Regions:
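DNA major-groove recognition helix of helix-turn-helix/homeodomain DNA-binding modules
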Residues: 201-216
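Short basic alpha-helical hairpin corresponding to helix-turn-helix/winged-helix-like nucleic-acid-binding
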Residues: 34, 38-44, 48-55, 142-170
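Recognition helix of helix-turn-helix/homeodomain-like DNA-binding domains
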Residues: 181-196
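N-terminal flexible/basic segments that precede or flank functional cores
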Residues: 106, 117-158
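Short basic helix-loop element that most often maps to the first helix and adjoining turn
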Residues: 118-124, 161-176, 180, 205
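Basic, Lys/Arg-enriched alpha-helical interface segments
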Residues: 1-67, 76-80, 88-116
């Protein structure tokens, strides 16, 4: 994948949360993390600043109606450091209970130390310190069947969310967009639902109809 940012894991906090989740939840979390690493502009639905915090952000994932939130901070414009994960709670509750602001204040001036990730000592903790290493442990190295399947689905997920975001910005329904570019509404729906069997020529027509340029990895 063509990365814009690099995701790193701080200590074992996120890994303990991650490994406790069922496979479907882990996949959805990884789609969101893939989006953070590869998309220049990340939809606010998936990545936003936490108001009232000192440099904290949240990455969101959804699975079967449940919301999963990952607290993170930026080491610089190109490095995202994952701190902890939770099922949906209010921002106020998260900041009060876990008091990450104090921890960040101690580490924010020593960002290089923050990025020296420590491997957890508990059993069954993942041994990875970056998102790329996490993908290797979860799906195998680049080029293996499981990894190729994940990459294809993750790219389709990013494309689907990019299309939804751009379509809503210009105020078009799926039906209106389909009529504008001369295709079927069902085709727009398939893309927005993350299907991978999409013709490139149609993708370019769709985004041209939105007055947008599209950049993505071919899958």
């Amino acid at each position: 994948m063509n990365k814009i940012r690099t995701i790193k894991l701080y200590k074992s906090y996120f890994k303990e949360f991650y490994i406790a989740q069922p496979k479907g939840v882990r996949d959805k979390i990884n789609y969101s993390l893939y989006m953070v690493e590869t998309m220049k502009i990340i939809p606010s639905k998936f990545f936003k600043n936490i108001v009232g915090s000192n440099g904290l952000y949240e990455i969101r994932s959804e699975y079967c109606g449940n919301i999963y939130r990952i607290l993170c901070c930026m080491d610089n414009d190109f490095i995202v450091v994952l701190l902890q994960g939770f099922q949906k709670k209010s921002r106020k509750h998260l900041l009060k209970k876990f008091n990450w602001q104090n921890d960040l204040e101690k580490n924010i001036s020593k960002r290089k130390r923050v990025c020296n990730m420590e491997t957890g000592k508990k059993e069954r903790i993942l041994r990875c310190s970056t998102f790329e290493e996490l993908l290797n442990e979860e799906y195998g190295c680049t080029g293996t069947p499981d990894r190729e399947a994940f990459d294809s689905k993750a790219q389709a997920f990013c494309l689907a969310e990019q299309l939804k975001e751009e379509r809503r910005k210009v105020g078009l329904t799926q039906e209106q967009l389909a009529k504008r570019i001369g295709t079927k509404k069902s085709y727009i729906s398939r893309i927005e639902n993350g299907h991978t069997d999409i013709q490139l020529s149609t993708l370019f027509r769709i985004f041209a109809g939105l007055g947008r340029r599209i950049t993505f990895n071919v899958f």
